[in-house]
Amino acid sequence: MIGPLVASRPHLAQTCEPKGATDVMTHDVTETEGLITARFHGVGGGSGPLTLGQDNMLRCIGRDRPEQINRESVWPVPEGTTVATAVDALRALLERHESLRTVFPPGPGKDGFPERQEVRAEGEFTVALVPVGDRDGAGIDALADELGRADVAVPFDLTAAPRLRFTLLTEGRLVHRLVVVGCHAGVDGVAVTLLIRDWLALAAGAQLPPAGSRTPLELAALEQSPQGRRKTAAALKHWESVLTAGPSSSFSVDGMTPGAAEGTAALLLRSRTAAADLEAVCRRTAAGPSAVLLAVFAALAAHRAARTDLVISALSANRQRSALADHIGTLAQDALIALEVGPSAADDDLDALIGRTKVASFTGYWHSTLNADKVWQLVEDVAERRGARFARQIVVNDLSLAIPETLSDARPAPTADPEVQWLPDQPLPVRLMLNILRTAGSLEFALLACPQVFERADAERFARAVPAVLAAAAAGPLPLTELAALSGLSPATRTGDWQRIGADWIDLAAVRALVADALGTRATAVDLGHQDGRLTARIATTDQDLTPAAAHHAVVAALPGRETAMAPHHYAVHHHPGPLPLLTWPTLPAHAEGSGRAEAAVAE
């Protein structure tokens, strides 16, 4: 998960009991061995339709493992915080934000999928207490990591509030660490960082003004308005255009095997010099830090993928809208950014790419208010028509405007510039992901790289290439042709029988395996032909019911995870009992043939 990368261990040390402190919790609290139960009494309540972000994440919760969806983070604790102070601050946090008190009762359908959200005005929450014993600071950090990894794998009860779980690491009544696990239907990554800001103020005794951001109920009403529905419809058209014409698999290269890797390598890079260079590039190109970093990331990714065009998924996309920047909830909808990276000519440079990135990212962000059910159906429909299924391989998540600098400043000072720190592997099904954590004063980002595409040494080269490119671009326009020398990265290879078909690089051996595996024993032999960008599958069978439509349906159903293959454009079905020599296929009469796509097969 990305949750651990949000806080990045910004712990504040405590070594003694606070002077004059009394550890008395205010009200509605019971404590048993290792567990505190307290009540919250929030303002407001009610029910309404789901927000589009809630709907999206509830579908993901029903499909994916808890550790892929829940969010774990370790929050900084102000020095001298007692258990009583912490519990009261957490109570105030729950009472302050409706999203944390929102539940999702089962809907009337057969699958029970929720159709509405309900905000609980009051209820109970629990706080686990774990003594740190004689551990030092590093040992406490390790314990916090261990507890977070265990808790993040536990699913949330969607019918019960709150949407957060809390664990305090304590020495007597003094709190050393706060481990928080969040349900992604209640909070996204940016919301977590905003909650950390509130927590720090509340734990320090501050009185906060009422929350001024839109509540999930208010957001849902806006999304269901005529204006909201028009925006959603426009977003769907944008997605259809990109899914139909853009690359379905940006990292279609040697080494890609069906299915995702067990773990995705993760590292954290910090550099003050790179932040100064980034600022210089922004001044010179009149672009913001997000656009510049996205352009650099895209240029390096395209170089590694040995292609000139990419489709990038940007998380927290709706956070780019000022009205939702401080929303506490889950927006959790992707922006789909189709980018011509280049180089389109020998003199194409990073400045020009930054300009293209600004336009492409604005278009993607503007069209990121999505109905998840319709988007998933669109993905299926395009896969059926195109024969290639979109894979979210390259991802960017810009959290830099939301993470308080105090979280970064609380870490130990870097020992080098740039400093690279390896993090625990993450269970994320991506090929390459950039999490931008900070841009002002220090450039800080977390890079996740799939081992099928990047060995660990290459992942580190990629990360170190970002400040190298910024340093070169700070001095003036940087030709894209110089990326190879700057990065030290070699482009990925495509050995064997690869063909460029539309926007995709396709491994014909993978297509043959796809068709054979999809049909199984229904096919006695399979042959694949390629001519003028079209793939034709010839299938020998004794199955009288096997038609082009049935074959195509089976092949498309087997596509997920096979990112180097696509379904053939045309199928010819031959009735024949056994294997056939290659020279026999052209003379064999076809029983039926056609595209298999929502059109009648031509019977022979």
Where are these regions (language model features)?
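Gly/Ser/Thr-rich phosphate-binding loops and adjoining beta-strand/alpha-helix segments
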Residues: A38-H41, S47, P66-T85, L158-V179, ...
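Short amphipathic alpha-helices and their capping loops
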Residues: I2-D64, D88-R135, P162, R214-G263
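His-Asp-centered acyl/peptidyl-transfer active-site segments
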Residues: I2-P4, R9, R63-N70, E98-S99, ...
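A short N-terminal helical cap/helix-turn-helix that marks the beginning
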Residues: V103-F104, W199, A203-T215, E240-S249, ...
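A short, small/polar-residue-rich loop/turn motif at beta-strand boundaries
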Residues: G3, S8, E31-G45, E79-E95, ...
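Flexible, Gly/Pro-enriched loop and linker segments at secondary-structure and domain junctions
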Residues: V43-L50, N56, Q68-V74, L100-P106, ...
